[in-house]
Curated annotation (Swiss-Prot):
GO terms for molecular function: protein-lysine N-methyltransferase activity. Keywords: Cytoplasm, Methyltransferase, S-adenosyl-L-methionine, Transferase. It comes from Shewanella sp. (strain ANA-3). It holds the Pfam family PrmA. HAMAP family: Methyltr_PrmA. Its EC number is 2.1.1.-. It is an enzyme of class 2 (transferase). InterPro entries: Ribosomal_L11_MeTrfase_PrmA, Ribosomal_PrmA_MeTrfase, SAM-dependent_MTases_sf. GO terms for biological process: methylation. It comes from the Bacteria. This is Ribosomal protein L11 methyltransferase. Belongs to the methyltransferase superfamily. PrmA family. Methylates ribosomal protein L11.
Length: 293
């Protein structure tokens, strides 16, 4: 069945109100899109901010008459009679198949591949991690995840113990194990992330080598040869003493989730405990690495 799509250009202040009104008018779904390619990098705790220029996209059944809805919207003082909008017919598709077709195996470094389960592994002799996109966690497509995967691929992890601080989907933890790590400990504040990491470890036959903890449950004496933390600048700074304590003398560190302009400050801060390397960059994001003093 085809659908009718209504797109309305507005701002972050009015988007929720318009969304509620369109649902009352019979919309079957509402999504918000960025109107001017303005990224939101690090929202405050508990916030789910919208872009200043927001596009409200409403989907209606094909036989819906939108004329009364448009007339109603014209009466809203914050939109006005000549508000910017677009109506178009959307063909029916197998949206699941369309979504799946967008994901392909990706190589990181020389050895490592991240492969969706429905795709054929390009190189059976490579280090292959089977991971499906899902939840709100890393799949390798984000620059910070890619930077961390490339770094792990560059290391000899044979018989090393690794900590994945902020493990999310478990992509870094599972990759480290597939690359030869003896044991990995994953830590995350979100129980859903713990479950996702567990499921992905089981899928890749490394669950028996992965220990997972919420922060309050992590062992007090936990230490590792390698620690990777792909979180954000604020938590990286706040958790720096704990992260440093978790790395053995001479151990290796990688930090990501940082914007380019945040990298130098975080590097300087961590230099209390680590000999820090030059930052690596991908798009607007950075990765810091260092060796424990």
């Amino acid at each position: 069945m085809p659908w009718i799509q209504l797109r309305i250009n507005t701002n972050s202040d009015d988007a929720e109100t318009i969304s509620d009104l369109l649902m009352e008018e019979g919309a079957v779904s509402i999504t918000f899109e960025d109107g001017k390619d303005t990224p939101i990098f690090e929202p405050k705790l508990g916030e789910t901010p919208l872009w200043q220029d927001t596009v409200v996209v409403a989907l209606f059944e094909a036989d819906t008459d939108l004329a009364p809805t448009i007339e109603m919207l014209k009466t809203l003082p914050f939109l006005g009679e000549h508000f910017s909008h677009k109506i178009e017919q959307i063909e029916d598709k197998d949206w699941v198949r369309e979504w799946m077709d967008n994901y392909h195996p990706i190589q990181f470094g020389k050895r490592l591949w991240i492969c969706p389960s429905w795709r054929e592994v390009p190189d059976p002799s490579a280090v292959n991690v089977i991971l499906d996109p899902g939840l709100a966690f890393g799949t390798g497509t984000h620059p910070t995840t890619a930077l961390c995967l490339e770094w792990l691929d560059s290391l000899d992890l044979s018989n090393e113990e690794v900590i994945d601080f902020g493990c999310g989907s478990g992509i870094l933890a599972v990759a480290a194990l597939k690359l030869g790590a003896k044991k990995v400990t994953g830590i995350d504040i979100d129980y859903q992330a713990i479950e996702a990491s567990k499921a992905n470890a089981e899928r890749n036959d490394v669950a028996d080598q992965l220990a997972l903890y919420l922060p309050e449950d992590q062992p007090a004496d936990l230490k590792a040869d390698v620690l990777v933390a792909n979180i954000l600048a604020g938590p990286l700074r706040e958790l720096a003493p704990l992260i440093a304590e978790r790395v053995k003398s001479g151990g290796k560190l990688a930090l990501s989730g940082l914007l380019k302009e945040q990298a130098q400050e975080i590097s300087d801060f961590y230099s209390q405990w680590f000999d820090m390397d030059e930052a690596a960059h991908k798009e607007d994001w950075s990765r810091l690495t260092g060796k424990r003093k």
